[in-house]
């Protein structure tokens, strides 16, 4: 079992943790989040970005992690970036808690997400369904108020 965690911080009040667990390279990765400080009753883009570099805030994390050269999509789409986790849905206090199993996100193997950055966006991810070029790159999810590098944990 490999475990990793990202502690999210940023310019705004958004923060929290994202935990990753994977049994073997062929197994799905369980992703569990506990995020606070978002707008109430909102959907916010949730992605893994390429670089574990936050020297210039969350913008240094680069584009979505996309080792297979696919277009942006929903987590259930075959055509999606590895880093496309969709949207977090917040409650009436702006908090989001949840868990999902993802077949594309890996902690083990050549396309591991360890050392990359989890980003919470300020807008809703259109899941690649917007009718413009940016939708197929970013989902039009907007600015990056919080992020954290994915590190190995015990």
UniProtKB/Swiss-Prot annotation:
Top-level division of the source organism's lineage: Eukaryota
Catalytic activity: 2 superoxide + 2 H(+) = H2O2 + O2
Binding site for Zn(2+): 64, 72, 81, 84
Major subcellular site: cytoplasm
Annotated binding of Cu cation, by residue: 47, 49, 64, 121
Record-linked Pfam families: Sod_Cu
Protein EC: 1.15.1.1
Gene Ontology terms: biological process: cell redox homeostasis; copper ion transport; fungal-type cell wall organization; intracellular copper ion homeostasis; intracellular zinc ion homeostasis; negative regulation of cellular respiration; positive regulation of transcription by RNA polymerase II; protein stabilization
Molecular function per GO: copper ion binding; oxidoreductase activity, acting on a sulfur group of donors, oxygen as acceptor; superoxide dismutase activity
Record function comment: Destroys radicals which are normally produced within the cells and which are toxic to biological systems.
Protein name, UniProt field: Superoxide dismutase [Cu-Zn]
Gene (name only): SOD1
